[in-house]
């Protein structure tokens, strides 16, 4: 009996399949699914609670209510399995068939499926070549459509109103046929010959010239070809039979009090059945046409609401005015089937609880409350109890566990040993948000967490909760242990830095112990070893920070590499160190020298220390070392007894004078403003600058006072040493707080921002130590509130960005070791404003070289192409001063579906070459998304203090060398003999003796050059200066000013300052000008020479025209004499807003969405020479003449800044009109490498501003996914249509096929898609549907009869298979190999049998490839 029951318990083996296909069901198909027709709208009898026969819950159609029991109760029990009761007609079987048996409704009149009617573009409209409006009028019985014009002059598919129709009937009689409603549309669809239509469309496409037509035809052709390929008939878009969902999936549940709770679908079905039955009756009664028509329209509307309520017209509502939830609503959106149930399942064997700190744990352990463990490990305990014979049955074992007998606790200990559990803290923003630990049983109800993993989980102990999951199967336990154990995940996958870095009190303790003090107790003593130092310290003979000499034993790598020689040998040397440092030397792992500890350990130093340990000593030693560091840190912090006291916040005495001086300067600016020397805007900018500087100065004075203290040394001399002030130590060590926060405590709070981001010009001069007055407190609240509001909004934004990133990259997995490409990108150090922002070593670390790395001095090859550059390699490269290395990149990887390991390089989370099967796409998405969330949550900590980088107003050299100017640099010499820059994109370079570029600086228009080309300079020399607050307009020629179109009230306004009474002329915006004629004129200056002739541009006919931009303040008068290099007008730069990641996060999203910026700059389309053509109204004409002499014209709005001058040679892709770059232009004109460099640099800029490190390769992976589609330019002999966008791998596969068959392959161009668009245009419809716009995706997929090959991770999660990544990739590979082998064996046997029986073999060509769908 038991065996029999076990048989029933066994789950059926899941079906093995390789793909899922979606299509349209034909009416016959729907009938074949059905188990009977639902004829009545009744559900269940409210008295007997039994389902009504032929109703929506009918047992005859859908199956029995109770297992193995018919409705009337005649047949009960298993023995009647499969019998159909003759009384009630119910089959005796399991009740769960009510979850899978469908019914159907025979519709009295056909009905259009709303998805194919209303999704944009309307599929019905496409196929019929009619407008949506027309089809709707026909379907909803407002108009007739001509089906068959016969001999009449009418056209097929012509629409006519009822009146027209009757007129035409009178005129032509029954020569023609016209219909209304879905029948008419169905006839039209039936009449379409798809093959014929496709042929005509293809030929028309070739012959037509108009862009609009090509677009229209291509769209229609795509839909028709889809029907042709998938074998779906267009008339199936019109329903004749409606399937009915199994009743258990739309349940009706009796509540107490005789009421019922029901699924909305039942209501919707009821309406359909009611209307359908009424319509049948009306047709039988031969009711008047108008009544029937109305009923048909109502049926159409009822079916529409069932399929997608609210898509057309008003949504159907239930009793409580709430719109009913239709079938479409069930699957779409966050609460729909895809995202709620398929991608976000709840799991068994899990629990959650609050976390508390567990400082006594080892890194791989976590404390699990006993009661929780007992519940989670129940099945294992039951099993153990049975095996040990304590309990005979599971029931008895249950009882034992419930009573919590002593034996149960012993067994729990045993079961739990070496059985890892997974801990997860929401939000899981990156892979380290779930890690495995070995549980240690503890009393209490809170989970204990190791302090060092908090950084990875972003956890703290202020009430955070974590979830525990138990891996059940042996394989799961093994994966948890080898891949997810906390001690195996010590690096951040985003940047390869250690994630187990101590923080807060640990750092404080280590820092305190490694500081040195002058004239501490016992200074100058010498000890024979660490144990002696310890004894002296315990006996209070020496202090922790005293300088002493100690003999220290280090374990160093053995030079002797022979057999049996130890790896490490001791080396003893005498070090001048401090007591604390020598005590810490005890925990150094072998292979690290004492010098790494012989300095004050701040947080950054400790991070570097752990990093060094990992690279030199390996994982195991590092983990042990980190644990011991933590223990020491806690112990030392306790011993140190550091605390905070109000008196620690020392306010600098010179604060008063600094603030006083600033106030004087501000007054001076007010006075200048009053007398009209500066504008209100300039005054504001200057005042803000003064207060920023003051805030800095006070802060500096405060830090100077705080950071050192006077002390007497051993010889009795006064000297200063680094301070032991508690607050200073906390900030300096990196334990808590920052200089900015200390400045607010003891310096001055400084400038605050308004909620809109603009800076309030009166700063808070007080600090928290002195206290704020009411006004100051009020201003402070602005910043604090903005911070809190921002946080909430930006967390959501950042989460959405992460979701889009994951969606676009989820199918990118490393699938092979090497794709063998010879392409790559050249990496250089990233230099900005003369400073090396990112060194070359950081950019190439962990990448594979694609060209040999050559020593520049000796020309010998250091590293061959194909070498993975590790730490030692990059250090060597840096030492030799190599400034460019070509490396492989994910962008140029030639693997079709996925990536290869060589192009990706090092797996940053593991520190070695990436494994095949690593889901690098998801890791990249998480690495970029995770800090976004972090940052967005982090803004308000500064309390809104306006931290604005002071604007640069000069450039100075950082290194010695020779000044060189780029070809684009142009300057003129003015009357004072100063060199004034007049080029917009000039750069100054500093080169070393070998002529290698050391730094590069942009020099803005209007700057004064202090050094010229070829000058030898020392570091620190100023190269150029300029006014940062205004942009000048400068003349390159001398002469007499002659104004044109400078008319007051038309193009310029006289601004009279209310305060000063002085007037200036300001150019006004064309949009604000009154009359139409004045909108096109542009105020400008012409110059006249001594004879009153217009000055001409040398070597051309054009006279000099200098235009003024909107907002320019004109500083010259009409008729004034000007010299070369003089300023004609100034444009004030806008008031500065504070920058934090608020600007940053949308910027990142904008880059990844590949949006074209508003006023994008214009790039040169060709290489050639520039000249200016004739200006049209409001636009200037720029002409580029290429090398063949062809001219390319650009029309440019006059207010734009043109960066080129007459006769300049520009290269293709060079910026010619100022403005933000458009990534699509960069891709088109400069190629993939330039595009990737642009996106990577721009994204990195945003993150760098926040001090977040992300490796470039993560961004490159995303860019690869944005480039995964191409646009066909010429289709050759392929199946594509010109202008169609297809998956790159598809394209390449098809071209390979063409080449193999000696046909013409297609040509294509790269296109850049934003991440949302790329996610939606993926080949997998399951993945796209679960992302966004579910209805549209499914509609399209159904018509095209799409097949999803389940390549990505998301599709596989949804269908419930192992994902094709990591161990799953190997599993699927093995499965496929086995299938292939089986198939070959099968074919072989078949062939042998065929040979034996002498039947002719089937030719190979006709054998259909076998796929499991």
Swiss-Prot record:
Cofactor(s), names only, from the UniProt record: Mg(2+); Zn(2+)
A Pfam family hit: RNA_pol_Rpb1_5
Location of the region described as Disordered in the Swiss-Prot/TrEMBL record: 1393-1413
SMART domains for the chain: RPOLA_N
GO molecular function, one term: DNA-directed RNA polymerase activity
Gene Ontology biological-process annotations: DNA-templated transcription
GO cellular component: DNA-directed RNA polymerase complex
Residues that hold Mg(2+) according to the record: 460, 462, 464
Cross-referenced InterPro entries: DNA-dir_RpoC_beta_prime, DNA-dir_RpoC_beta_prime_bact, RNA_pol_asu, RNA_pol_N, RNA_pol_Rpb1_1, RNA_pol_Rpb1_3, RNA_pol_Rpb1_3_sf, RNA_pol_Rpb1_4
Cofactor remark from the record: Binds 1 Mg(2+) ion per subunit. Binds 2 Zn(2+) ions per subunit.
UniProt binding sites for Zn(2+) 1: 70, 72, 85, 88
Catalytic activity, EC: 2.7.7.6
SUPFAM superfamilies: beta and beta-prime subunits of DNA dependent RNA-polymerase
Reaction catalyzed: RNA(n) + a ribonucleoside 5'-triphosphate = RNA(n+1) + diphosphate
Binding site for Zn(2+) 2: 819, 893, 900, 903
Subunit structure, as described in the record: The RNAP catalytic core consists of 2 alpha, 1 beta, 1 beta' and 1 omega subunit. When a sigma factor is associated with the core the holoenzyme is formed, which can initiate transcription.
PANTHER family (UniProt xref): DNA-DIRECTED RNA POLYMERASE, DNA-DIRECTED RNA POLYMERASE SUBUNIT BETA
Family the entry assigns: Belongs to the RNA polymerase beta' chain family.
Function of the protein: DNA-dependent RNA polymerase catalyzes the transcription of DNA into RNA using the four ribonucleoside triphosphates as substrates.
Protein name: DNA-directed RNA polymerase subunit beta'
Annotated source species: Paraburkholderia phymatum (strain DSM 17167 / CIP 108236 / LMG 21445 / STM815) (Burkholderia phymatum)
